[in-house]
Amino acid sequence: MNANELTIADARDALAKGELSAVDLTMACLTAIDAGTPLNAFVHATPEIALDQARAADARRGAGAGALNGIPLGIKDLFCTRGVASQAASNILKGFKPEYESTVTSKLFEAGAVMLGKLNMDEFAMGSSNETSCYGDAVNPWKVDDRRLTPGGSSGGSAAAVAADLCLAATGTDTGGSIRQPAAFTGIVGIKPTYGRVSRWGIVAFASSLDQAGPMTKSVRDAAILLGAMAGHDPKDSTSADIPVPDFEAALTGDIRGRKIGIPREYRMEGMPAEIEALWARGREMLADAGAEIVDISLPHTKYALPAYYVIAPAEASSNLARYDGVRYGHRARLGQGDGIVDMYEKTRAEGFGKEVQRRVMIGTYVLSAGFYDAYYNRARKVRALIKRDFDEAFAAGVDAILTPATPSSAFGLGEMADADPVAMYLNDVFTVTVNLAGLPGISVPVGLDAKGLPLGLQLIGRPWDEAGLLNHAHVLERAAGFVEKPRKWW
């Protein structure tokens, strides 16, 4: 086994015993990144920074070293990294190098992590297939015939890099499923924490009331380790919760006897593939065999989640993206003679934003306009409150976690849905958006392969602030499923 194929937990042990140096581990990842160019996962590699950090980690080894000392990670391009290009995969931020570090990356570096570089994503995190990126498509390491498949989105580069062993783990962000859907498409683990568990400071904003950062890893244990380093109160983020961070790894007891797992009947969608239904049934059996009690529950407002999400998220995006005007940073359009400031705004935004971002800004501006605010935005906010209430009632009735499919299908081909009706693409988030609207933690765990040999995942949804319990349920599901398949290397 090459060092880059290790999990965080195994690498941590090997580093502690002196069987491996952080420099060797980092070099193995940098070699894999060079070989993995066809995946287009890393868009800004930072080998010099990585090796400097690895040497420092080796010097620190032993007492007092952080939980991630010497562990090489990939960072989604949405996180501001000081002095390193941070473009949110958009032409409008071309050449932008922040003068400050995001709270998440600061915490990772304090824990001793090594940054291998920045990862591909959908532009401004708007997309479900990593096809809206200014860097071009990220490619799923899993393949069927000669079709290039999507790794999912928006954290597609993160998912592809972890699944292909280019890094030990990666950061992602999740606004409507952008950690969990790509994790399911690539056979890895991805957790979206409770809204407010991880600081959003220094993460380029898409929809501020929905965005949440989280880890994308090779195992549930790794997710627990990485989340422990990322989480915590941050006075610089007013939505960050001042709640103690438990030892998530210590919570992985593997004992869920007597725990109640809810199965929401509304997630049985019309036209759902039989494979997804069968996988869901298998997941129920695995948790029941581990001693959990399986109960049917109702989340009656589920069917309104996607329409509400695609009003609220674009509305917040149109407000957040108003700051990109070519005045202070990023791209500025070349102006003609006689052009004024308004011409500069219009030309800069037309050149800098891709089609999907433009579409969502237009939708958002429309639903926030005076004539339509009550009909769309206010109504969507009311629906959001009802969706949250559905979950609150289920948890109040004693449910500890909720089991659902993660995605309505396995990974689809690049280009196959991009030209279709955008609504068809938006349906990829059908099982995940409710979790963001309610601010809950959710995790995707790989459980099996479909008939084509592509990975499928199940989602577990937890009580607010109970990532520890959620990770333990996911740990049980992961062990029972025994998913060890890896993509066959073609790159």
From Swiss-Prot:
One of its GO terms (molecular function) is glutaminyl-tRNA synthase (glutamine-hydrolyzing) activity. It is an enzyme of class 6 (ligase). It comes from the Bacteria. GO terms for cellular component: glutamyl-tRNA(Gln) amidotransferase complex. Keywords: ATP-binding, Ligase, Nucleotide-binding, Protein biosynthesis. It comes from Cereibacter sphaeroides (strain ATCC 17023 / DSM 158 / JCM 6121 / CCUG 31486 / LMG 2827 / NBRC 12203 / NCIMB 8253 / ATH 2.4.1.) (Rhodobacter sphaeroides). This is Glutamyl-tRNA(Gln) amidotransferase subunit A. Allows the formation of correctly charged Gln-tRNA(Gln) through the transamidation of misacylated Glu-tRNA(Gln) in organisms which lack glutaminyl-tRNA synthetase. The reaction takes place in the presence of glutamine and ATP through an activated gamma-phospho-Glu-tRNA(Gln). Belongs to the amidase family. GatA subfamily. Pfam families: Amidase. Its EC number is 6.3.5.7. The keyword Magnesium does not apply. NCBIfam families: gatA. InterPro entries: Amidase, Amidase_CS, Amidase_dom, AS_sf, GatA. It catalyses: L-glutamyl-tRNA(Gln) + L-glutamine + ATP + H2O = L-glutaminyl-tRNA(Gln) + L-glutamate + ADP + phosphate + H(+). The gene is gatA. GO terms for biological process: translation. The active site is at 76 (charge relay system), 154 (charge relay system), 178 (acyl-ester intermediate). Heterotrimer of A, B and C subunits.
